[in-house]
Amino acid sequence: VSPLLRAQETLAHIQTYFKDVPVLLCDKIKPDDDAREAVEWLSQIPYESIVVVCHMNVVGHIAELLTHENFNPFALAEARIYDQAVIANGLSTQKNSFIPTI
């Protein structure tokens, strides 16, 4: 999760449903950070399934690197599900997406 306030607020909401999930703070997934550094950091995480709580534009650029598809910005509060054996450039496939409604 990003250290910035909005990501921390989103994390707090997620934790109301998933109380015992480990949380890792990452200073490489803020809006203007380098997506390549973020992917490198994410590739070191020792979990089979992860949730990345961060910001545009970096999350769009992370998705671009992982899928080798053109940059596609996320909608506000959008969640996307990707499948990959390992986190590495070009090895992910988007499986689904979700935009919450009020």
Q: Can you say where each PLM-predicted feature lies in the sequence?
A:
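Phosphate-coordination/substrate-recognition cap region in phosphate-metabolizing enzymes
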Residues: 1-48
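Residue-level signal for the start and early helices of compact helical domains
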Residues: 9, 14, 20, 65, ...
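Short, flexible active-site-adjacent loop segments at beta-strand->alpha-helix junctions, enriched
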Residues: 29, 56-58, 86, 98
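Low-complexity, flexible helical/coil segments
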Residues: 34-39, 58-64, 86-92
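A polyampholytic, Gly/Pro-enriched intrinsically disordered region
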Residues: 42-54, 93-102
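Non-DNA-binding regulatory cores of transcription-related proteins
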Residues: 44, 51, 56-78
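Domain-level recognition of soluble alpha/beta enzyme cores
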Residues: 69-93, 99
